Amino acid sequence: MNCEVKHALHCAVLVAWIVCFAYFCGVFTEPAEGTVPESPVASYGLVWTICLYLLRFTALLVLPQCLCNLCGLMMFNAFREKVQLKAAPLLSPFVCFRVVTKGNFPLLVKENIDANMKTCFEAGMENFIFEVVTDKAINLPPNPRVREVVVPTAYRTKSGAKFKARALQYCLEDDVNILQPTDWIVHLDEETLLTTNAICGILNFCEDGKHQFGQGVITYANGDIVNWLTTLSDSFRVADDMGKLRFQFKLFHKPLFGWKGSYVVTQVEAERDVSYDHGMEGSIAEDCFFSMVAMKHGYTFDFIEGEMHEKSPFTMWDFLQQRKRWLQGILLTVHSSKIAVVHKALLALSLYAWATMPLTSLQVFLCPLFPLPRCLPFDFLLSFVGALNLYMYIFGVVKSFSHKYRNSFLRLGMYLAGALMTIPFNILIENAAVLVGMFGRKDQFYIVNKDIQTV
């Protein structure tokens, strides 16, 4: 089955799933007589009726994100397995792979640098260097293609940026930066592993040179899986990359909903112009804040073909803390006076949809207990949101575990069942992250342990 057939099948299944889900939710059928009050105000009272309708409308805050995911998943083929180079690697621009770390896991960094460098050579890459930016010296072995940059303890940015933003800004200082304005930087987390496809996609993007920033897909199920629960939960993020992220970059060339902090490709001149020096509000989710400022400056973005590999958090506590930091960082970004509403409007809707999850989750119990009169367009949109979000888990598993279930439909079925079983856990964790994030301290940067040797 070639990639075109797979994509056509996926589109047909997605549309059928959305329609069937709406049908089984009763969107197209009239409720049994006497089960739905004709006047909710008379049955529930004015205040409670308003609350019920507000909850329904709140559930649609995520609609723009769902529509972008739908368009991204249907408009672009996600099943092409090989990325073709458009030009010889020898003629490609100079690329710096930059890894930022606290220095707590030196062995992990060393092993991944070696593995990634080997992948670069296998892809035929010549013009590159790896730069490890660390708070603590990790004493990498001497190598002309590896540069270790230790951020001085006394270093302070002009605005007081902290954590990863501070380290990234240090690399851009005149007396530290060794790159030319036309060179390119690929930002990686300390556990990120390159693939030949990702390198080909990066070289194509850099060679094209039309856009200053780019990003691709990260999957989390390669190699040994430490925690199946968190890995299956992260399958949603893979589908989100293939849907919303791809759609916003391919069609609009703007980070309308923000972007991730890894597998980030930037042109040096543009990155130095935008900078990471945006104070405390730009230090918790420095990636998201950076993308908003770059969009404000008029820079353009594109989607990069080829995937990279990372690990999901190893523990439920790390999973919770990771989500909490994302929520707090996006909250600070959305509420920043430095970014105009026109640039952060869709990001804000996405944030508020996330922040109101504890309330919208209650509808699972409230809808059967307090039914409201039918409104076909409104009810269909609600069922569409639910159907698409469920499908995202399924699609994410199909993409993430493709190397593990080849020629085994039984194994694929097990992975899909596992993903669906993790949904209640994921909802619980996301709700807990919202509560902890909204009412907890917003000046902390939790570092997730991705070193498998410490587990």
Swiss-Prot record:
<comment type="similarity">
    <text>Belongs to the glycosyltransferase 2 family.</text>
</comment>
<dbReference type="GO" id="GO:0006486">
    <property type="term" value="P:protein glycosylation"/>
</dbReference>
<dbReference type="GO" id="GO:0009636">
    <property type="term" value="P:response to toxic substance"/>
</dbReference>
<protein>
    <recommendedName>
        <fullName>Beta-1,4-mannosyltransferase bre-3</fullName>
        <ecNumber>2.4.1.-</ecNumber>
    </recommendedName>
</protein>
<comment type="function">
    <text>Glycosyltransferase with a proposed role in glycosphingolipid biosynthesis. Involved in susceptibility to pore-forming crystal toxins in conjunction with bre-1, bre-2 and bre-4. Involved in resistance to the nematotoxic C.cinerea galectin Cgl2. Has a role in determining brood size.</text>
</comment>
<dbReference type="InterPro" id="IPR029044">
    <property type="entry name" value="Nucleotide-diphossugar_trans"/>
</dbReference>
<keyword id="KW-0978">Insecticide resistance</keyword>
<comment type="pathway">
    <text>Protein modification; protein glycosylation.</text>
</comment>
<dbReference type="Pfam" id="PF13632">
    <property type="entry name" value="Glyco_trans_2_3"/>
</dbReference>
<keyword id="KW-0808">Transferase</keyword>
<dbReference type="GO" id="GO:0019187">
    <property type="term" value="F:beta-1,4-mannosyltransferase activity"/>
</dbReference>
<keyword id="KW-0963">Cytoplasm</keyword>
<dbReference type="InterPro" id="IPR001173">
    <property type="entry name" value="Glyco_trans_2-like"/>
</dbReference>
<dbReference type="GO" id="GO:0005737">
    <property type="term" value="C:cytoplasm"/>
</dbReference>
<keyword id="KW-0328">Glycosyltransferase</keyword>
<dbReference type="GO" id="GO:0016051">
    <property type="term" value="P:carbohydrate biosynthetic process"/>
</dbReference>
<dbReference type="InterPro" id="IPR027389">
    <property type="entry name" value="B_mannosylTrfase_Bre-3/Egh"/>
</dbReference>
